[in-house]
Structures are given as C-alpha cells and as structure tokens.
Amino acid sequence: MVMINFQHIDGEALLAQLQPLLGNIRGKLTPNVEMRKVTWFRTGGLAELFYQPVDEEDLALFLHNLPECVPVTIVGIGSNLLVRDGGVPGVVIRLSPKNFGQVQQVSSKGFLVGAGTADKHLAAAALKAEIAGFHFYHGIPGGLGGALKMNAGANGVETAARVVEVYALDRKGQRHILSLKDMHYSYRHCDIPEDFIFTAALLEGEPGNKDAIRAAMDEVALHRETVQPIREKTGGSTFKNPKDTSAWRVIDEAGCRGLQIGGAQMSEMHCNFMINTGQATGYDLEALGETVRARVFAHSAHLLQWEIERIGQFEQGRSVASFDPFH
C-alpha cells in the first residue's frame, strides 16, 4: 500500500515507492523537475515526479498502474500556465511535441493531430496542404491539448469550429472517443470529466487556396507583432473576456496598465498580458492577477475570470487569496 504525504515535495521518495508498481513503462520518469524550465513564464517550484510518455499506449499503461491516490497534472507546451512556488505534488505528465506532435493528413480537408502539437505547426501543415480554416492557430502561443481543453481561439475563430473527434484517456488509462457534441464547448471552456487527458484529435477545415491561407496567417502574425508582447516571458491572455467587453479594456480603465508587483507586470503593450520582467515568482504573478481582478471589480463591477491555468501549491507563508467579492 502506498503511503504518501503530498504536502511535502519529495520526488526521490515517491519514485522509490512507485517504481515497483508501474510495470514496463517506456517513458521517462524523473524526480524533482524544475517547472520553471518548462513554462513560458519561467517561474514555479518542483514537479515531484515528471513523466514524459512515448505514446498513447505507454501513457495508458502508466495511468492504469499509477495508484489512484497519486495526484496527476497534465501539461503541454507550458504557455498558458502559472506554476506556484511550492511545487506540484504527485506526477506531472507532459505530452511533448516530440512524442505527441504528429500532424497527419487523413482526408482532403482533415488532419489527425497529436495533443502535443504546437498550434503554429498545425497552421503551417494546413498551409502546406492547402486546407483553410486553421490560420488562426498561427497566432495562438500554445499546443493542441490546451486548445482542445479551453476552446482556444483568435481572430474570430475557435477550436470548436474545427473539431470532429477528440481522443482521450481517463485516470485509469481507459480510452474514450468524444464527438464535438460530447465536448460541450462554450467560450474558453469544455465540459468533460476532469480526469480526461486529451491525446489527439481529428480536425477538419475546408479546401483552400495557398495564397489566401498565407495572407490570413500573415495578418494574424502582424496583429500579434503589433499589439502583443510576444518577445516577453508571458503566458498569453491572462483573463477571459467578459461577455459585454474586452478584458484589456476594463483592465486599462481600472488603471492597471503597467501595474507591477515584484517582477510581475501587466504589459504596457497589451494590458491583458502578464509578463515576467526578469525575476518574478509564481507568487508575484498570481498576486498581481488577483490585485487586477479586485481593482477591475471595484471600478466597473466586472469579475474577471482567469484564462491562465494555475497549478501546484503555494510556498509556505506566501499564499495568494482568490478575490471573491461575494464572500
């Protein structure tokens, strides 16, 4: 029986307990990995264990053999991710572009795409195949797994518009095939069981003209270059847009453009982008985000919701309270 204290990060001890139980897994299992090295913010504590499966079959075996008491956290490219300074207990599973980054054309307008595929690589593959409708991925700084989970979108198009089927594993390693209807998509959200791990998806666009597709991608790239701090350490859009306006607008109107806590700052260029100016901690970033939420609510009664995913536990004595005006 596995007896583990997940309040204290001790990857070596956890690895020693789990190795005899995991069977013939083929992926790389590493203790005490610095999460700052795998996130775009370049912040965060240790992953107690860090697993990189080689394929879906390997991941299924790992999940099947992993005791249910062990917490599991999934990461991909690490763009839309804030890792807290106290680290991530249990196992962090990363679906890498190397092992889950295939883009296979399966029809005149469709691709089978691995969840570890960078969005911009999907856009490039669609350009090469002259399949329209994927240009917006050229402007999303992330991977397909995250795009499927949050219904990522840009330039008026969302991931839901391209999905035919999504392939997932549950916490026990069982495979599931989800239709577009099964995903229950809404703005920056899908409603599926929390333990599901996306491994790939069947996506479809429309036959297109290469010059027109390239022009659409160039327009996306120019927009990003002009209005977003793409050369900074950032996680992309910090908050979801409210129903009746843009997040950046209410942030700006509340006087939060350029607001800074420690090494974290709301970008002067695009104030819905939070940046690490050099030495930010996870605490700095999350404290800044919650401060912005409070100021925006006080100014306009808009309650901003995080778009960036926050994982892990706080460092002892340095927790950040989530702003809640109703309690």
Curated annotation (Swiss-Prot):
Gene3D superfamilies: 3.30.465.10, UDP-N-acetylenolpyruvoylglucosamine reductase, C-terminal domain, Uridine Diphospho-n-acetylenolpyruvylglucosamine Reductase, domain 2. GO terms for biological process: cell division; cell wall organization; peptidoglycan biosynthetic process; regulation of cell shape. Signal peptide: none annotated. SUPFAM superfamilies: FAD-binding/transporter-associated domain-like, Uridine diphospho-N-Acetylenolpyruvylglucosamine reductase, MurB, C-terminal domain. Its EC number is 1.3.1.98. GO terms for cellular component: cytosol. The active site is at R188, S237 (proton donor), E307. Pathway: Cell wall biogenesis; peptidoglycan biosynthesis. Cell wall formation. This is UDP-N-acetylenolpyruvoylglucosamine reductase. The lineage of its organism: Bacteria, Pseudomonadati, Pseudomonadota, Alphaproteobacteria, Hyphomicrobiales. The gene is murB.
